[in-house]
Swiss-Prot record:
SMART domains associated with the record: BRLZ
UniProt keyword terms in alphabetical order: DNA-binding, Nucleus, Phosphoprotein, Repeat, Transcription, Transcription regulation
Name of the molecule in the record: Basic leucine zipper 63
Biased composition (Polar residues): 96-133
Native organism taxonomy: Eukaryota, Viridiplantae, Streptophyta, Embryophyta, Tracheophyta
Induction context: Strongly repressed by glucose.
Molecular-function annotations in GO: DNA binding; DNA-binding transcription factor activity; identical protein binding; kinase binding; protein heterodimerization activity
Keyword check for Ribonucleoprotein: no
Sequence motif: Nuclear localization signal 2, positions: 295-302
Length: 314
């Protein structure tokens, strides 16, 4: 509820009389206050129908005679009037009304004065009731209806830019999530490959150690073979490859004797035949001796290998 106060009502000429103030001269602030009240009342008459605000005017007390107290009283009245005008104009004045009133010089002065008073007294802005405030939807609707085509295009362009930026952010987020999953998979594969590499290197190290051990064993076996050969030479005094030669000769001579025994028992064999058979037996023995030389070597080698194996087992 708003009510426009006239200068007579606020100054108190209509409702009360100032005791002993007729003789006082009015200062510049009083004249400015009266001028502001006149301009605000003229602007209120030109505007729309107004409703009374919640400010109730009570019968003012007697105005003090002291000039300083009188100035303080006028200042409080001025603050009340400025608050009422600010509430009215902040609620009902549209941009069209302000553009229409900009042509009037007096209206501009009153608006500037009201703005200055509202800036000087920010505590009066809290007196605006919630019923006088417009909701966000109503303000947006009024803004859309009052916007010109260029503003509409600019708003549409801004909305399209925001939507494209939102889509690009979503695409980037999806791409980053995909890259993170790939990185996690690659890390798992890398860990598996590193584990396999460590296993292979451990196996290689074990194999190399075993190879060195086997080579050392081979060298020791060769040294043992040489020592065994030298020991055999010292004990026998000759090459061990020919120490079984008398046995081989005896085994070779046995078939010749067995082959000659039937010739001696038969009564039909003559002396020249016996001589010729004796010569043939000697030739056979010589051939068998030459043939068995290689056999003796093989047997001696086998015997030596057996002895080396027995020494190695020990």
């Amino acid at each position: 509820m708003e009510k426009v106060f006239s200068d007579e009502e606020i100054s108190g000429n209509h409702h009360w009389s100032v005791n002993g103030m007729t003789s006082l001269n009015r200062s510049a602030s009083e004249w400015a206050f009266n001028r502001f009240i006149q301009e605000s009342s003229a602007a209120a008459d030109d505007g729309e129908s107004t409703t009374a605000c919640g400010v109730s005017v009570s019968s003012p007390p007697n105005v003090p005679v002291d000039s300083e107290e009188y100035r303080a009283f006028l200042k409080s009245k001025l603050n009340l009037a400025c608050a009422a005008v600010a509430m009215k104009r902040g609620t009902f004045i549209k941009p069209q009304d302000t553009s229409g009133r900009s042509d009037n010089g007096g209206a501009n002065e009153s608006e500037q004065a009201s703005l200055a008073s509202s800036k000087a007294t920010p505590m009066m802005s809290s007196a605006i009731t919630s019923g006088s405030e417009l909701s966000g939807d109503e303000e947006e609707a009024d803004g859309e209806t009052n916007m010109n085509p260029t503003n509409v295009k600019r708003v549409k362009r801004m909305l399209s830019n925001r939507e494209s930026a939102r889509r690009s952010r979503r695409r980037k987020q999806a791409h980053l999530s995909e890259l993170e999953t790939q990185v996690s998979q690659l890390r798992v594969e890398n860990s598996k490959l590193m584990k396999g590499l460590t296993d292979v290197t451990q196996t290689f190290n074990d194999a190399s150690v075993e190879n060195r051990v086997l080579k050392a064993n081979i060298e020791t076996l060769r040294a043992k073979v040489k020592m065994a050969e030298e020991t055999v030479k010292r004990l026998t005094g000759f090459n061990p490859m020919f120490h079984n030669m008398p046995q081989i000769v005896s085994t070779v001579s046995l078939p010749s004797e067995t082959s000659n025994s039937p010739d001696t028992t038969s009564s039909q064999v003559t002396t020249p035949e016996i001589i010729s058979s004796g010569n043939k037996g000697k030739a056979l023995i010589g051939c068998k001796m030459n043939r068995t030389a290689s056999m003796r070597r093989v047997e001696s080698l086998e015997h030596l290998q057996k002895r080396i194996r027995s020494v190695g087992d020990q």
